[in-house]
A protein has these predicted regions:
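Nucleotide/pyrophosphate-binding catalytic subdomain
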Residues: 1-208
Length: 209
C-alpha cells in the first residue's frame, strides 16, 4: 500500500486540502494518508490550554469561538453538498462544545493532551468527508485505535502492527485510508502525542506492511 504524509501547511486552507485530495487520488492505488492538524490550529489549542491552566475561561472561550468560526467558513468553502455541509458543521459544533467543556473541570497535562489532539481529529474528519463528497471511496482510521507508545515514549511496534493489520483486514474496498499524524495512546491507555518526528514512525510502519 502506498503511504503519503502531509504536514499542517499542506492542509492549511480549503484550497490546499483540495490539492492534497487531488494528489492522493491521482494514482488510483490504495493509499494510506497521514495528516497533521491545519497550520495554526495546534498553536491555538495550546493557547486555549494555557488559558484553562490559568482558569481564564473567557480567554479560552474567545479563542475557541474564533477557531470555530474559521472552521465553519472552511466547511462552506469545501462542502457544496448541503447534506454533507450540515453533517460536517454538526460534527464541528460537537467538537468545539467538547473543547468548551474543559472549563468545568480541573485542568492538567492529561486534559491538555486531549485538547491538543482535537486539531488532527478536525483535519482528518474534514478531509475524509470531502473525499466522500467527491465520490472517492475513503475511510478514516482513528490513530487512537492502533497507535500506542510504551513507557519510554517510543512506538509500541508489536501493538501497532497487530492492530493496524486487524483494522485493514476489516476495512477493505477503499482507495484512501486517512489517519492522524501525532496523536496516540500511551502505556496507560491515555490520549498522548508522539514526539517530534513521530509521524515518520507511523509512515514507516505502514510502509512496512
Amino acid at each position: 500500500m502506498k503511504v503519503m504524509k502531509f504536514g499542517g501547511t499542506s492542509v492549511g486552507s480549503p484550497e490546499r486540502m483540495k490539492n492534497v485530495c487531488q494528489l492522493i487520488t491521482r494514482s488510483g492505488q490504495p493509499t494510506f494518508v497521514v495528516l497533521s492538524a491545519m497550520s495554526g490550529t495546534t498553536n491555538s489549542l495550546v493557547e486555549i490550554s494555557n488559558y484553562f491552566y490559568k482558569k481564564n475561561i473567557d480567554g479560552a472561550h474567545d479563542i475557541i469561538s474564533q477557531l470555530e468560526r474559521k472552521y465553519m467558513q472552511h466547511a462552506d468553502e469545501l462542502f457544496t453538498d448541503q447534506k454533507v455541509n450540515s453533517e460536517i458543521k454538526e460534527f464541528l459544533k460537537e467538537r468545539f462544545m467538547f473543547l468548551r467543556s474543559f472549563s468545568k473541570d480541573t485542568f492538567t497535562s492529561f486534559e491538555e493532551r486531549i485538547v491538543v489532539a482535537q486539531g488532527e481529529i478536525l483535519s482528518t474528519n474534514i478531509v475524509t468527508a470531502y473525499l466522500k463528497q467527491q465520490g472517492v471511496k475513503a475511510t478514516l482510521i482513528p490513530a487512537l485505535d492502533f497507535m500506542k507508545i510504551d513507557k519510554n515514549q517510543e512506538p509500541d511496534m508489536m501493538h501497532i502492527k497487530k492492530e493496524i493489520n486487524e483494522i485493514l483486514s476489516r476495512e477493505t474496498g477503499y482507495q484512501i485510508y486517512i489517519t492522524q499524524g501525532f496523536i496516540c495512546k500511551n502505556a496507560y491507555d491515555e490520549i498522548d502525542n508522539l514526539q517530534r518526528g513521530g509521524s515518520d514512525y507511523r509512515s514507516e510502519e505502514h510502509t512496512s506492511e
